[in-house]
Amino acid sequence: MIKDLCTVVCRNKNLLMLVTAGIYILALYSALSGHTLLFSVLITFAFAAFLIKDYFKPKYILIWILIFYFGIYNTTSRLKDTDELLNLAPVNSVISGQILSIPQNKGRDKTSFFFKVNKIEYDGNVREFDNEKVLVTLNTNEKLKIYDYYKIKGRLSVPFKAGNPSQFDYGNYLRNFNVYAVFYGAKGAEPVFLNSDLSAREKVLQWINDYRQKIISTHSNYLSSPNLEILGGIVFGDDAVSPPENIKQSFINSGLLHILAASGMNVAFIFSFFFFFLSALKVNYKVNISAGIVMVIVYSLMTGLGASVVRATFMLVFVLIGKLIDRDAHSISLLAFVAFLMLLYNPMYINDVGFQLSFIVTFGLLIMTPFLMRGKNKFVNWVIGTVSIPIIAQLWVMPIQIFYFNNISLYSVFANIMSVPILSVISFGGFVSSLIATVS
């Protein structure tokens, strides 16, 4: 029976890629859990048994072993218990460096962002660094730009640690971003802009972010808070536009938080809009597809590159490249391959809730919706999809919601079913108004 199952895996590209990605993910979890030796022994013995029993071809066993141990190395080489800034904390200081993330307004005149620290001045001492980061929180609404350089006065501190097993550990959360300390700006002390030459890449990315900010500013002429942040979250995601905490909590309680996260629907809408627009202009098919790829990538950069957007962008780009070279993509294997690529680039994605939700929900939809939408009547399929997709998504997301948010709303499925048609209209209006804002 086991041999038959292994034979099926070897003959099915979807299952083969799924197993490969699963082995790599297992390696990451073994490294992050601190049980690397135990998992290594178990995996090695398991692969040896598969080889002896001739369940898999030797080349598969060799590839999987290499992937497993590379996953452990790739994770452990990036992990550290502390960094130089954490060793200095707590201390009043002045830091100089570069903003690395989109500055987010947290309400009540608070702005936060990740900051690369090049230099710190404290107690008459000066130290320079190559690659140290902190999460900065300032008491200001000053318009700060990603990739600009600043000097900031404040206090370097140790992030909050959990006091019991079920409590949120802020320090561990920041480790996912390779950040080990936090910095709070001094009251009344505005950040000082430092002149510095940006690279060509940084200038392009800053221009893209400025373009997004122009769109949001145009919307602010007609919308007030929190409607502005909600629309911005629907269009660009909460990585780019952060809604007020009370609004965000309401979406969490109702099981609608995904609405505020840019997702595959946004990416698909952007591509579809430009594809049909260029098709109406009789643009060459391959040129049309290529232009769509560029627009999708630009949009993903505008959103702040949240895990769900990166996943959707990668999948769509690979599908479109397949169209250009007349190749079809296998949905499950493509999803697994994209997960593998993202975790190869940054193993800490594995702890990102957005990453987990995006891939688990997409996987659930890919394996369940084809069985429900087999009919030939398009209207019937549309009705079935409208009702079943939110239910399927909620079923797959429920364990993660309980684990991270310690709650589950019984009406969330109904709320999702009701919100899908409305969300489509709001998204369409938001994207159209955003396009108008770019030319106004």
Q: Where are these predicted regions, by residue range?
A:
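General structural signal for alpha-helix termini and helix-helix connectors
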Residues: 217, 221, 236, 257, ...
